[in-house]
UniProtKB/Swiss-Prot annotation:
Requisite cofactors: adenosylcob(III)alamin
Protein name, UniProt field: Glutamate mutase epsilon subunit
GO terms classed as biological process: anaerobic glutamate catabolic process; glutamate catabolic process via L-citramalate
Biochemical pathway: Amino-acid degradation; L-glutamate degradation via mesaconate pathway; acetate and pyruvate from L-glutamate: step 1/4
Record-listed adenosylcob(III)alamin binding positions: G69, N122, P179, F296, K325, E329, I333
Top EC group: isomerase
InterPro entries reported for this sequence: Cbl-dep_enz_cat, Glu_mut_E
Protein function: Catalyzes the carbon skeleton rearrangement of L-glutamate to L-threo-3-methylaspartate ((2S,3S)-3-methylaspartate).
Keywords: Cobalamin, Cobalt, Isomerase
NCBIfam families reported in the protein's UniProt record: MthylAspMut_E
Keyword Disulfide bond: no
Gene3D superfamilies associated with the record: Methylmalonyl-CoA mutase
Amino acid sequence: MELRNKKLTHDEFMTERQQVLKTWETGKNVENFEDGVKYQQAIPEHKRFSLALLKADKEGKTLSQPRAGVALMDEHIELLKTLQEECDLLPSTIDAYTRLNRYEEAAVGIKKSIEAGTSKLNGLPVVNHGVAACRRLTETLQKPLQIRHGTPDARLLAKISMASGFTSYEGGGISYNIPYAKRVTLEKSIRDWQYCDRLMGMYEEHGIRINREPFGPLTGTLIPPFISHSIAIIEGLLALEQSVKSITVGYGQVGSLTQDVAAIQSLRELAHEYFQSYGYTDYELSTVFHQWMGGFPEDESKAFAIISWGAAVAGMSGATKVITKSPHEAWGIPTAAANIQGLKASRQMLNMVNEQKFPPCPAVELEIELIKSEVRAVLNKVFELGNGDIARGTVLAFEAGVLEAGAVPLPKDILDLHHDYVAERARCEGRQPTFQMVVDDINAVSHSKLIGRP
């Protein structure tokens, strides 16, 4: 079937569903869609992700959410019970094997974790645990729960997660393929995520609002806002077509105050612009700001400065929520205690800037207009390549270098502006403008500075 941005028919969905449920043994326990609907309908409002986001936006508050996930269900429950005392929203981060549909290896990881008495996986293998165990998780906790992963083919994971009572689902056919996988075609991952979005849309049609969040940071470090914005908007459009009504678009911190504030503000405005111009008016839109996703210094005091800076920018920019980091980022997967430290530092800063939104100023306004011009140039080309179809256009845009590198269709005046900025930096640093500048910038924060000057 040729890829198109078109709502899946009931027959198409049900035929595919039967194949999906057979991909692992726990699929047989979620065959009854109505059972999942009834379970979701019984979830109290204070545990529903979309309502928490809607309330936060209305009140002008920024919610906090960590990342967290371990192999064994009892340990995962205890971890999240600890974290929920300090955060507004809870995650369940999925392990690397599940992200690649390698459920046999995830099962081995569970066995080794039991034997070792500690997690041997970097997340929770939801598919292996199945719906009964996951319902025990969602019933025990008192905060809204989201699945966070990195899965190109997340269809079975989506089915089990929704039937288990999770009320938000992160990812998309672009953001969970290009940064994460090298053997999955974009055409396949977009089509697989149309299935995921249609599943969420079916819950919506039964009165259950599931929040969907494209993954904003992509590869994690120093992504130009116009690239991440374009992909977030594309994935939002794809989800809306499948009847999803709650969309959270995201962005990863780059470190420049004016650019980060402008990015969050322009992201919301551009998403509304494109969603509505293509006929989608019945939806809820929120934003997420990811604290610095690059390298961290080993010194905890320095790490706290980075965390606090990210929280301040998230709050002042008006982001609906912030994904927090821990002071142990340089060492690996953080402990619960380290995660709580990051949450507490973030909450202190969020409380302090809650009524101090960043004021309009020429520098931010200029950056907003620059980002908008760049995004419009790219998205207009994507639609052109697809003859009006954003799904087909996206595949062709990556092939042509429009959405990645090589042929990004920015106007000449904007290209000249960027060229002048790079040339000015090269003169200041006394070196030729090369890719080494990017490498130096990626490493700069872990060396206690923002710009990687020699």
